[in-house]
A protein has these predicted regions:
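An N-terminal assembly and electron-transfer interface module characteristic of large anaerobic redox
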Residues: 1-229
Length: 229
């Protein structure tokens, strides 16, 4: 049976109600069974998020203790699939870098607002917080994975770049669907490592400016001198 109903997955109580409404006509399930299953899944999801954040903090502590460098490999959930990411995480660890996902450090970052875009998606918000946290820590860099098929990535890549460059940090973007050849990716990662080492060797001071976006407001006084197209 194929079913594709709308489900409010951000509301545990309402999610249980909707699942019961959709499943009970086809399956022998009671309301309490559905409610208990949703609650168990909810607890497991929270436990997963807590463990991810804890592992992120543990990895950051080890990086600093051992004097290593880390990469926040920021991508969508499907980029975790080895068939999609083409082994980029393993490539990075093979180069001596620790690899973290954006959701393992996002809870440590606070976004400088306002942003230039409308920040209305959970993944985007998590990505921007991870980028903001990266700007304040020289032992980690952010590499963003995007897929051409996802149009919203064009918005996130511009905003992440602005957040990083506002604090003088390097921005690296890898477009997953440009090919499965890791040779080009390996060259870019080696170049990034070389740039990091050169920056640290020179002890270059990063030029810092606010990452928040200053909107230009059209006032009545501007009416005589400007035209909105």
């Amino acid at each position: 049976v194929y079913m594709d109903p709308f489900l409010p997955i951000n509301d545990e109580k309402r999610l249980a109600e909707r699942l019961f409404e959709e499943l009970s006509p086809r399956f022998d399930l009671t309301r309490s069974e559905v409610r208990d299953a949703v609650h168990a899944a909810w607890l497991e999801q929270e436990a997963f998020r807590d463990e991810t954040a804890r592992k992120g903090e543990e990895t950051l502590a080890e990086i600093r203790e051992r004097g290593l460098k880390g990469i926040v490999l920021a991508g969508r959930p499907y980029h975790l699939d080895p068939e999609i990411n083409h082994g980029i995480p393993e490539l990075l660890t093979g180069l001596g870098l620790a690899v973290l996902t954006e959701d393992s450090v996002a809870h440590l970052g606070n976004i400088e607002r306002p942003l230039r875009i409308v920040d209305q998606w959970t993944y985007h918000n998590r990505l921007y917080r991870a980028a903001q946290y990266t700007t304040g820590n020289r032992d980690i860099e952010l590499v963003q994975l995007t897929s051409f098929g996802c149009g919203l990535d064009a918005v996130t890549s511009d905003q992440v770049q602005e957040i990083l460059e506002a604090k003088g940090r390097m921005y690296t973007l890898i477009k997953i669907d440009e090919g499965s050849n890791l040779g080009a990716v390996r060259i870019r990662m080696r170049s990034l490592i070389a740039a990091i080492k050169e920056r640290d060797r020179r002890e270059t001071e990063e030029k810092v400016r606010p990452a928040s976006y200053k909107r230009v407001v059209f006032t009545k006084e501007m009416k005589k001198r400007y035209t909105i197209l």
